[in-house]
């Protein structure tokens, strides 16, 4: 039986577990909240911090595959797990790109994925300089 871990136990984690119920998969979830939506559907629940290197590494080292249900996870620990043979989805390199919204938008532009125009600002004065860039959505990079 495949041992599959999910980092994060929110609604997406719960939906992943519901789909996994149709397959020969032993499920593991790590989340800081023991009452999260996914906690009671998995075979094994671990209370832990998905942003903490040691928690993520220790959670994943005995598993066959690890995935995420939220992007705010420790990608360094995921990279170490992948280096040691655990299958990680999405790949830690991809996660590093999608975690930072500036990197994500620049990557989309580079590979010509249709995406809205954007301006990167790093200060209040730069934000004022681009006040005519409307409509706009303002996001923190990471």
Where are the regions that the model predicts?
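ATP-binding N-terminal substructure of ATP-dependent carboxylate-amine bond-forming enzymes
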Residues: 1-99, 103
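Active-site nucleotide/adenylate-binding loops and adjacent lid/helix of ATP-dependent enzymes
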Residues: 95-142
């Amino acid at each position: 039986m495949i041992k599959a871990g999910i980092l994060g136990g929110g609604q997406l984690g719960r939906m992943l577990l519901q789909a996994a119920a149709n397959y020969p998969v032993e499920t593991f979830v790590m989340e800081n909240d023991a009452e999260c939506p996914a906690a009671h559907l998995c075979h094994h629940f671990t209370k832990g911090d998905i942003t903490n290197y040691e928690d993520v590494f220790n959670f994943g080292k005995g598993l066959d595959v690890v995935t995420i249900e939220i992007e705010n996870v420790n990608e360094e620990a995921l990279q170490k797990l992948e280096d040691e043979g655990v299958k990680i989805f999405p790949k830690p390199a991809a996660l590093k790109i999608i975690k930072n919204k500036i990197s994500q938008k620049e990557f989309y532009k580079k590979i010509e994925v249709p995406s809205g125009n954007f301006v990167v600002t790093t200060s209040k004065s730069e934000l004022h300089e681009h006040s005519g860039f409307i409509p706009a959505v303002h996001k923190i990079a990471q």
